């Protein structure tokens, strides 16, 4: 049952008019779990993070000096598609929750071992499909499984050209907040963390990026 259905039922019992011109068609599995990411084109001070740590997107903007400054302020999970200087990993290992290494076209098979020697937990992930990933797996045999990052379109949304969505995940970049990678690439900044409704259009050139984060969204359409 969706939120507006509960409100409508309560209003009906109280004989109060309920006029809400939208209906929820999808709620992602992670929608109740607030998380904050930060692109290291800035250094931010955030206290009382919901998860207890910041997610640092070095894959969006690789900048080691800002990484160092951010680690001085917050514990971080680091997402990167490039190797990070091993001296940084060693110096800040108590501030690094884990490193998520994205295996891409310019992957470096030795990097997981450098992370391990620094005493930092890590995971391996990739946007590659199985056909492209299989020849690479042997290089990471001793490092562990490479988990796929899946681009998934829920059945409820396959036939929709556009809709409204709200997110529980925010990416901070250049002093602005974005409620998805789709919004970040389009420059669609959120008004606030609470008021972050945006419109999705499947013809947008960055539409494919939206589906990687679908579990973070609530989706509404006009009635």
List each model region and its residues.
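Long, low-complexity regulatory tails in eukaryotic proteins
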Residues: 165-223
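Detector for Asparagine
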Residues: 15, 30-33, 41, 48, ...
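Non-catalytic interaction/regulatory modules that flank or connect domains
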Residues: 16-117
């Amino acid at each position: 049952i969706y939120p507006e259905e509960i409100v409508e039922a309560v209003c009906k019992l109280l004989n109060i008019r309920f006029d809400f011109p939208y209906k929820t068609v999808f709620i992602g599995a992670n929608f109740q779990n607030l998380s904050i990411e930060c692109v290291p084109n800035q250094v931010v001070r955030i206290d009382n993070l919901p998860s207890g740590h910041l997610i640092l997107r070095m894959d969006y903007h690789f900048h080691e000096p800002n990484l160092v400054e951010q680690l001085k302020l917050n514990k971080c999970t680091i997402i990167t598609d490039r190797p990070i200087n091993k001296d940084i990993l060693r110096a800040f290992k108590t501030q690094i929750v884990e490193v998520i290494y994205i295996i891409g076209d310019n992957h470096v098979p030795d990097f997981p071992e450098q992370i391990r020697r620094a005493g930092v937990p890590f995971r391996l992930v990739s946007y590659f499909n199985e056909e492209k990933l299989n020849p690479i797996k042997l290089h990471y045999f001793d490092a562990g499984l490479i988990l796929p990052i899946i681009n998934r379109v829920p059945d409820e949304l396959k036939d929709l050209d556009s809709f409204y969505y709200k997110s529980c995940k925010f990416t901070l970049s250049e002093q602005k907040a974005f409620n998805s990678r789709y919004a970040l690439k389009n420059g669609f900044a959120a008004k606030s963390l609470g008021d972050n409704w945006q419109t999705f259009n499947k013809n947008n050139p960055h539409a494919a990026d939206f589906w990687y984060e679908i579990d973070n969204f609530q989706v509404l359409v006009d009635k």
